[in-house]
Amino acid sequence: RNQPTAALGHLLPEGTPVPLIPVLIIIETISLFIRPLALGVRLTANLTAGHLLIQLIATAAFVLLPMMPTVAILTSIVLFLLTLLEIAVAMIQAYVFVLLLSLYL
């Protein structure tokens, strides 16, 4: 029940040579800590990219409004649809984040 070999057994592949055991344990431990961190970075990058796209389109619609009102209105409609898409993507990203985090831990 409290055997360290059983608890740390998943850090080593079967048949690992004895001199490589300390190095592989360190590498696998670092890998276990990096996975959730990389998952958070990916989630942040995906959400930031969506927000930047919405900001760019909103700025374009604002600039186009005095010159071409019809194009600005069409751009605003596209902006609204992209906002709905961004909300859906955020929900999917949250689901994937929680699912993968629970698998990693």
Swiss-Prot record:
GO function term, MF aspect, one: proton channel activity
**What membrane topology is annotated for this entry?**
Multi-pass membrane protein
User: Keyword Ion transport, does the record have it?
Assistant: yes
Q: Which domain of life is it from?
A: Eukaryota
Q: Which reaction is catalysed here? A: H(+)(in) = H(+)(out)
Family membership noted in the UniProt record: Belongs to the ATPase A chain family.
Which Gene3D superfamilies does UniProt cross-reference here? ATP synthase, F0 complex, subunit A (1.20.120.220)
Question: What is the name of this protein?
Answer: ATP synthase F(0) complex subunit a
Under the subunit heading, UniProt states:
Component of the ATP synthase complex composed at least of ATP5F1A/subunit alpha, ATP5F1B/subunit beta, ATP5MC1/subunit c (homooctomer), MT-ATP6/subunit a, MT-ATP8/subunit 8, ATP5ME/subunit e, ATP5MF/subunit f, ATP5MG/subunit g, ATP5MK/subunit k, ATP5MJ/subunit j, ATP5F1C/subunit gamma, ATP5F1D/subunit delta, ATP5F1E/subunit epsilon, ATP5PF/subunit F6, ATP5PB/subunit b, ATP5PD/subunit d, ATP5PO/subunit OSCP.
Q: Which UniProt keywords apply?
A: ATP synthesis, CF(0), Hydrogen ion transport, Ion transport, Membrane, Mitochondrion, Mitochondrion inner membrane, Transmembrane, Transmembrane helix, Transport
Q: What does this protein do?
A: Subunit a, of the mitochondrial membrane ATP synthase complex (F(1)F(0) ATP synthase or Complex V) that produces ATP from ADP in the presence of a proton gradient across the membrane which is generated by electron transport complexes of the respiratory chain. ATP synthase complex consist of a soluble F(1) head domain - the catalytic core - and a membrane F(1) domain - the membrane proton channel. These two domains are linked by a central stalk rotating inside the F(1) region and a stationary peripheral stalk.
Q: Which residues span the membrane?
A: 14-34, 47-67, 72-92
- CC terms in the record's Gene Ontology section: mitochondrial inner membrane; proton-transporting ATP synthase complex
Q: Please classify the protein's predominant subcellular localization into one broad category.
A: mitochondrion
Whichever gene encodes this chain, its name is mt-atp6
Q: Which compartments is it annotated to reside in?
A: Mitochondrion inner membrane
| Swiss-Prot/TrEMBL GO biological process terms | proton motive force-driven ATP synthesis; proton transmembrane transport
